[in-house]
Amino acid sequence: MIIERARVPLSRWQQAAVAMGSALGALVDPRRADLIAALGETTGKPAFEMVLERMKKSEEGRAILLERPRVVSEQVGHAWDLPENTFGAAYAKFMGSRNFSPDDRPPVRFMETDELAYVATRAREVHDLWHTLFGLPTNLIGESSLKVIEFEQMYLPMCMLSVIGGTVRFNEKQRSMFLKHYLPWAVRAGRQCTDLMCVYYERHFSEDLEQVRRKWGIIPAPQHPK
């Protein structure tokens, strides 16, 4: 399997070294998705183990673990052909308007087992689906807000570190807007919605976007205050 072949076994000391190096590198250049991904993997094992156990207790979660769907062009390309009101079409519009490709995510390399590697891969690949569901942009405020939701859902240390790093890079207006409007919303939204790692999104692409939001308890992001 591709996920298994991509894995790099690390000792505890090596994990610590990769985590520290990734954290420092990500602070210097927050655009380095590979460093942020490595940080998430080397610090996130306990969190991914908890997510895995929750998925095993959920009907859709078990189906995901059994079938191992991937959010890649080959498997989700049909979303571009769905009616405008659907969740799948909204995802396609989100991706297309930004010239994003589902295939751009870096591979998981530092998880100990194939099963955990898949869970980490799934968490990484549904990121843009969550952007779509919550109506969040990909600017600094949008990404920081989604990291808060991801932390509430998965308790990944990397998510909280990313939020802290994001607030440091905010200008005064952005920081005020985030702390006053987006942070409280993101905490509430992340806690109120269903367990999003146990949702088999691909099975719901053809459903109405607003209906799936209601079904999963999604609170869309606040609009930018005037």
Curated annotation (Swiss-Prot):
Family matches, as HAMAP family: Coq4
Mode of membrane association: Peripheral membrane protein
The entry's keywords: Lyase, Membrane, Metal-binding, Mitochondrion, Mitochondrion inner membrane, Ubiquinone biosynthesis, Zinc
Q: What is its EC number?
A: 4.1.1.130
Q: Which residues cross the membrane?
A: none
Question: Which pathway does the UniProt entry assign to this protein?
Answer: Cofactor biosynthesis; ubiquinone biosynthesis
Keyword Membrane (UniProt):
yes
Which residues hold Zn(2+)? H127, D128, H131, E143
The task this protein performs is described as: Lyase that catalyzes the C1-decarboxylation of 4-hydroxy-3-methoxy-5-(all-trans-polyprenyl)benzoic acid into 2-methoxy-6-(all-trans-polyprenyl)phenol during ubiquinone biosynthesis.
Q: What is this protein called?
A: Ubiquinone biosynthesis protein COQ4 homolog, mitochondrial
**Cofactors that this protein relies on:** Zn(2+)
Organism of derivation: Arabidopsis thaliana
GO cellular component terms given for this protein: extrinsic component of mitochondrial inner membrane
Has the keyword Iron-sulfur been applied to this entry?
Answer: no
- Name the chemical reaction catalysed here: a 4-hydroxy-3-methoxy-5-(all-trans-polyprenyl)benzoate + H(+) = a 2-methoxy-6-(all-trans-polyprenyl)phenol + CO2
The remark listed among the other comments is: This protein may be expected to contain an N-terminal transit peptide but none has been predicted.
* Entry's family note: Belongs to the COQ4 family.
Subunit info here reads: Component of a multi-subunit COQ enzyme complex.
Q: What is the lineage of its organism?
A: Eukaryota, Viridiplantae, Streptophyta, Embryophyta, Tracheophyta
Report the locations given in the UniProt record: Mitochondrion inner membrane
